[in-house]
A protein has these predicted regions:
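Active-site region of the double-stranded beta-helix
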Residues: 1-123, 137-145, 149-201
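Aromatic-residue-lined binding/catalytic grooves and analogous aromatic/hydrophobic interfacial grooves
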Residues: 129
Length: 201
């Protein structure tokens, strides 16, 4: 297990060290941590914070974003996804990210889970996950739950009409979201392209 503060993260993203995450991390204290995993693409209270404004005006260069959250309990890889844009994660608790490189996805859209690397993310850390990085829901530390703020371009992860223009479309699980699942995760409608162990942390 590496840390996002180590040099190894540079392949997958970067720590955004010069922004204040204190307000939004404190706000996340009031949000539930369910036994399963819950994702909300955009949350009104989170989008009324100063850091949401910083994300739009600075990190995303003036483009509109949505600020939501992913909370719960998870210890498994289950799937990997990617977007056409960076995603910013802000750890509202300590958590672990399991990351891979899109360049390692084969032409048939399969991916060997042995290539996945795990990174510890300390509470309060903001990390930009590059568009070329495979990722999914965080994992908790030592069996504990996690809370994570998720920032993406506005309109990401919404319902999408199925299309069949290119072979990659079979991975399209939501708007701006391409998903490769592990068969053991039993994700309805997903393409089961992860090969090897469904990693547990």
């Amino acid at each position: 297990m590496q840390s996002v503060l180590d040099a190894g993260i540079k392949k997958y993203g970067r720590v955004i060290a010069d922004i204040d995450t204190g307000e939004i991390v404190k706000l996340m204290d009031s949000y539930d941590m369910p036994e399963d995993v819950v994702y909300v693409a955009g949350d009104e209270k989170l989008e009324n914070t100063q850091i949401h404004k910083v994300m739009e005006e600075s990190i995303y260069g003036g483009c509109p974003v949505q600020t939501g959250y992913c909370n719960g309990h998870n210890q498994k890889l289950n799937a990997l996804e990617y977007h056409r844009s960076s995603e910013v994660n802000i750890a509202a608790t300590d958590m672990i990210l399991l990351l891979g490189s899109r360049e390692d996805v084969k032409d048939d859209f399969t991916y060997e889970t042995s290539k996945v690397e795990g990174f510890f993310v300390p509470e309060g850390t903001a990390i930009e996950v590059y568009a070329t990085t495979l990722h999914y829901a965080p994992c908790g530390v030592d069996g504990q739950g996690f809370k994570c703020v998720v920032v993406l371009p506005k309109g990401t992860n919404l319902d999408v009409v199925n299309t069949h223009a290119t072979a990659e479309d079979k991975l399209l699980a939501a708007s701006n979201k391409w998903l490769i699942a592990h068969e053991d995760a039993h994700i309805d409608g997903a393409f089961n392209g992860l090969r090897g162990e469904n990693i547990t942390v």
